[in-house]
């Protein structure tokens, strides 16, 4: 069975999520092309036609990043396949961000990843999307207008893109990790560290994934040259798989997490760390609940892996 609320959610919608600990925001597209916000502040709410933050082309990717929840940025594609930005600042509310004015043209099948650079109070943004020549392009905001950054080379047309930023305690500046799929269907990582810049090598994290699989990533517990990362993608068994990077072990643990519909998009958020009885993980996806509702998976130290909210509002 479906519900009137679930029927408003686009099947295979782009999904993005941001948080400040367990204060959660989830973004998705409705069947009319509008981008809506559902939120968790002790209980789930919103996600209705009154909670629209902007409009995008139908089937657009949805990416988001935040500084706590004081500054939120949500990225989608226009009908003309240019990047656009919906911005929220506490005290101001939602407005159209400056990225749209730059008219950065991307491939019609481009996905998007977005990060605020970690470890600085400055609002510095990095967006990753696929150009019409199928290369992955970085777009940068450092407070003085949007500019093209580093081109990270060719990728599978329509590849998913995951990204995270963190700051090693012994490094003078933020690090970035991004993941995408290559033409031979490998899932690979590119890495940026402040003392090195972008490393030239691609690190394979999974040998063969379904073409255009969704990719989402998070990191936590940054320490002295140490980090913990979790990367998620939809495998050919129609379940989300998790790939773990743990300090001292590298990429080591890969396995299935939870079933989804074919072609589901995926969003991940985390807070806390192993050192502080964490982390907490939250995954968002579509698994067929009420046909098209967005569903939640939870991991924490106390209870391990389990399904969370079965259907986010408006379902």
From Swiss-Prot:
Multispecific lectin that is able to recognize L-fucose in all possible linkages. These could be found not only in decomposed plant matter in soil, which is the natural environment for A.fumigatus, but also in various epitopes on human tissues. Mediates binding of A.fumigatus conidia to airway mucin in a fucose dependent manner. Homodimer. Lectins have particular value as specific probes for investigating the distribution, structure and biological function of carbohydrate chains on the cell surface of animal, plant, and microorganism because of their specificity for defined carbohydrate structures. AFL is suitable for detecting core fucose on cell surface glycoproteins. The keyword Metal-binding applies. Alpha-L-fucose 3 binds at residues 126, 138, 150, 198. The gene is fleA. Zn(2+) binds at residues 244, 246, 252. Sequence repeats lie at residues 2-53, 54-103, 104-155, 156-207, 208-260, 261-315. Alpha-L-fucose 4 binds at residues 177, 189. It comes from Aspergillus fumigatus (strain ATCC MYA-4609 / CBS 101355 / FGSC A1100 / Af293). One of its GO terms (biological process) is adhesion of symbiont to host cell surface via host glycoprotein. Alpha-L-fucose 2 binds at residues 73, 85, 98, 146. The lineage of its organism: Eukaryota, Fungi, Dikarya, Ascomycota, Pezizomycotina. Disruption phenotype: Increases lung infection and lung injury by A.fumigatus. Keywords: Lectin, Metal-binding, Repeat, Zinc. AFL adopts the six-bladed beta-propeller fold and contains 6 binding sites per monomer, each located between two adjacent blades. The 6 binding sites that are non-equivalent, and owing to minor differences in amino-acid composition they exhibit a marked difference in specific ligand recognition. Residues 2-315 are annotated as: 6 X approximate tandem repeats. Alpha-L-fucose 1 binds at residues 25, 37, 94. Alpha-L-fucose 6 binds at residues 44, 282, 296. Alpha-L-fucose 5 binds at residues 230, 242. GO terms for molecular function: carbohydrate binding; metal ion binding. This is Fucose-specific lectin. Belongs to the fungal fucose-specific lectin family.
